[in-house]
Amino acid sequence: MKRIVLIGAGLSTKSLVPYLKDRLESHQWYLRVLDRDLKVAQHRLGEETSQCSAAAIDITDTTLLELELADTDVAISMVPAHMHMNVAKACLKLSIHLLTASYLSDEMKGLDQEVKAKNLVFLNECGLDPGIDHMSAMRLLDGIREDGGDIRLFESFTGGLLSPESEGDNPWRYKFTWNPRNVVLAGQGGAVKFIQEGKYKYIPPHMVFRRTELINVSGYGKFEGLANRDSLKYKEAYQLEDVGTLYRGTLRRPGFARAWDSFVKLGMTDDSYVIEGTNDLTFREYTNLFLAYNPKDSVELKLKYYLNIPQDSDIMSKLVWAGIFSDNKFPFEKGTPAQCLEFILKRVWSLNQSDKDMIVMFHKVGWSQGGELKMVESSMGFEGMDSSKTAMAITVGLPLAIATKLVLTGQTLKPGVQMPITKEWYGPILDELEADFEVTFSDSMVDYKGY
């Protein structure tokens, strides 16, 4: 009986665990679900059987971790990204295949030779973004190359958004569908880098939310695309060393970025220092911390003046709706500006039970072939069922689950530290997502448009 150990049983495993559990008997697998919180592990697994069980674990306890991993065939690590190496080192020592949905770190890359020497697979970036974005992009790019095309332009965007039917009167047309902290801290990791028409381009952190691209995705409407931090790191992986334009980004509804930029300019997304005495502050007083002293003007007036926001601007209506001027108080004694903003936004941006989220992915590829310039737009939209069965959780967990099946069923897979960017990975994973789960892409040829 093949043994699978899942380490970390958070939101992203909501579809992963049922997929594996449904196949335990037919494939003769055993599933062990581990989490630092026993109740979380038990809740995620559901009823224990002779082929599945749950337990608590502290993965910083190397002895306990190795004990749990003994005689395991595949480990799936869904712990915070900075803790993957704890699991990776144990897997390497015990000769266990490892799968994660997280970005491939330099430290993980450094294990490549040792992983190959043991004929192991250490698969990373096999979720949604990163994950399905890589696989769908490489399917497009490989197909064009096989037909003799020379890639000149590649753009890719993904957004975790609200389904239109759940937007209601929410002026942001957005709620948290994933880790709120990551949303609040977005854009703070240094300058954005990409290539446009053969020129390297850079956007400093304070301008990330002012430089957006308008994108119309057929069937899903208009969006604004915000550049991801480093598109260039995928040049080699995508075999795009000579491409003229390479740009990866995030989708939001129009108007989101300008309003969010207000939080950035105020300093509310700063996570580098702590505000003391927050339990004595209202949200309104917190907002006033970032504005000049003027006892005669209201907080709203000072903010509009400081940020040069017109009275009737939809930016102001978004800020009011977000609750930064309310008299609610913080329940904690101290926190960074970013932590305080996250607390405020979670009150209005947490999904209600009936809310549906939506994933939208969009690729644009331009190439030359036989003296002609061609372009294809490829899009995918996928809606969740409700706040417990979200599109985000489904599309993050299922690729990993299918990849686990590929490893355990003896598919011909090359060893090493890798991403799912070869046909041996993206072929069967995308095929199953489309056939069984309706995660489908629609491609359309359009007139070539450069910059």
Predicted regions and their residues:
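Conserved N-terminal Rossmann-fold NAD(P)-binding element of oxidoreductases
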Residues: 4-11
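Hydrophobic/small residue at the entry helix of a nucleotide-binding pocket
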Residues: 12, 16
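Helix N-cap at the beta1-alpha1 junction of Rossmann-like dinucleotide-binding domains, i.e.
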Residues: 36-40, 105
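Rossmann-fold cofactor-recognition segment
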Residues: 48-60
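Conserved Rossmann-fold cofactor-binding substructure of NAD(P)-dependent oxidoreductases
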Residues: 58-70
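ADP-ribose/adenylate-binding Rossmann-like module
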Residues: 90-108
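Rossmann-fold NAD(P)-binding glycine/threonine-rich loop
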Residues: 102-124
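C-terminal catalytic/substrate-binding lobe primarily of soluble NAD(P)-dependent oxidoreductases
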Residues: 143-451
